[in-house]
Design a protein with these regions (language model features):
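Compact, glycine/acidic-enriched structural inserts
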Residues: 36, 89-123
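Long, His/Glu/Asp-enriched segments that create or flank divalent metal/ion-associated functional microenvironments
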Residues: 171-194
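A contiguous strand-loop segment
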Residues: 1-93, 126
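Extended amphipathic alpha-helical segments with heptad-repeat/coiled-coil character used for oligomerization
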Residues: 134-175
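Function-determining sites in protein domains
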Residues: 111-113, 188-195, 199-201
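Secretory/export targeting leaders with adjacent low-complexity proregions
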Residues: 118-131, 139-140
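Conserved small/polar residues in nucleotide/adenosyl-binding loops
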Residues: 202-210
Length: 214
């Protein structure tokens, strides 16, 4: 299972693992500022931010798994096989194929807030890159130093969620992932309080007491 995560302390970190048992010969790919991106329905963008990430490069097109642009905005696509639904081209929308979404967002946006604005009129289309490379069912996490969002294209349309957990994995949709965290709210690095039989010692307590006697 793949997982994306952001960490912000004094510095800011974003990363993901690619938990697959096979390889598409992915490699580190750097796209300079004026390298042309030819979008299926939105023309060509030759004036964009530079970006670096892991990609499967086909016919000069980096099919990014994840990337970070020169402004510090990062984005990763993770598997979303049971829930992802892409749509036909829609009028009055920016129609972007799933394999185009990372360069489309990172090429234009400096921040999560700008990405939110751009996503308001976005439609993710059913287009595959080629007959041999059909569209992958994905959802995306977008991150900067100030915040984090998740983008999911489903049967009822495009959803953009603030992601306060700063983590995203594959299925289910993000609201259910956040709900599932409630099952683990009792976990702690501290020893639990013994409310069942206070006269009994936990194993670790007994070991500590034995060491103090020695």
């Amino acid at each position: 299972m793949c997982t994306a995560i952001r960490l912000t302390t004094r510095d800011h970190y974003f990363g993901r693992n690619l938990d697959l048992e096979y390889s598409y010969q992915e490699t580190v790919a750097i796209t300079p500022r004026r390298y042309p991106f030819h979008f299926r329905h939105e023309g060509t963008n030759s004036d964009h931010f530079a970006m670096i990430g892991m990609a499967f490069v086909v016919d000069g097109m980096p099919l990014y798994y994840e990337a970070t642009n020169e402004k510090g905005l990062s984005m990763a696509g993770l598997n979303f096989p049971a829930s992802a639904v892409y749509h036909d081209v829609k009028p009055d929308c920016a129609n972007i194929a799933s394999f185009e979404l990372i360069p489309y967002i990172l090429g234009q946006c400096e921040s999560v807030q700008e990405a939110k604005t751009l996503l308001q009129r976005l439609n993710i289309t059913r287009d595959g890159f080629s007959e041999q490379l059909p569209p992958s069912p994905l959802h995306w996490m977008i991150d900067d130093r100030e915040g984090c969002i998740v983008v999911e294209s489903m049967a009822d349309g495009l959803h953009v969620y603030d992601n306060w957990s700063n983590v995203m994995t594959n299925e289910p949709p993000l609201p259910l992932q956040l709900e599932n965290l409630a099952h683990y709210q009792a976990l702690s690095p501290e020893e639990p309080v013994n409310r069942f039989a206070p006269c009994l010692l936990y194993t670790s307590d007994a070991a500590d007491e034995a060491r103090s006697v020695d």
